[in-house]
């Protein structure tokens, strides 16, 4: 396994729309393992392949503290949405930035697991939010782009200042 580099917003590569995985093979399983290692090391709960500059429809997540419920979504598609909720989100590609985003309260998603087997998951709460957040990444959307133009501008300014101080 290997740690992967997580792209940082506003890197243009984060806006690349991911292509479907054609075959779930050893290459994809290695990517999944590397994504889990990277996500856990970064103390995240979800990671999309787009964030590590691999533009294929692969997502990993684990909402538990003890890393006991790893979930893999290959070629995920949300087939149903219901309700509305607002939750303060963060992102490994936008470190230190958190803001409230409105999303569906419940979702039904279809995907393949790391063995290439199709499954359906009905999710609510944080899991539903995380699924939508990570699937946005596969469409080239970063959560801050769901905020008002004013908030987006403030975040970009904050990130530019932070970048100047780290150089």
Swiss-Prot record:
- Secretion signal span: none
Under the heading Gene3D superfamilies, the entry gives: Peptide deformylase
Molecular-function annotations in GO: metal ion binding; peptide deformylase activity
Under catalytic activity, the entry for this protein gives: N-terminal N-formyl-L-methionyl-[peptide] + H2O = N-terminal L-methionyl-[peptide] + formate
- Cofactor(s) needed by this chain: Fe(2+)
The enzyme's main class, written as a single word, is hydrolase
Q: What does the cofactor field's note say?
A: Binds 1 Fe(2+) ion.
> What does the sequence similarity comment in the record state about its family?
Belongs to the polypeptide deformylase family.
Q: What does this protein do?
A: Removes the formyl group from the N-terminal Met of newly synthesized proteins. Requires at least a dipeptide for an efficient rate of reaction. N-terminal L-methionine is a prerequisite for activity but the enzyme has broad specificity at other positions.
Protein name, UniProt field: Peptide deformylase
The scientific name of the source species is Neisseria gonorrhoeae (strain ATCC 700825 / FA 1090)
Q: What is the lineage of its organism?
A: Bacteria, Pseudomonadati, Pseudomonadota, Betaproteobacteria, Neisseriales
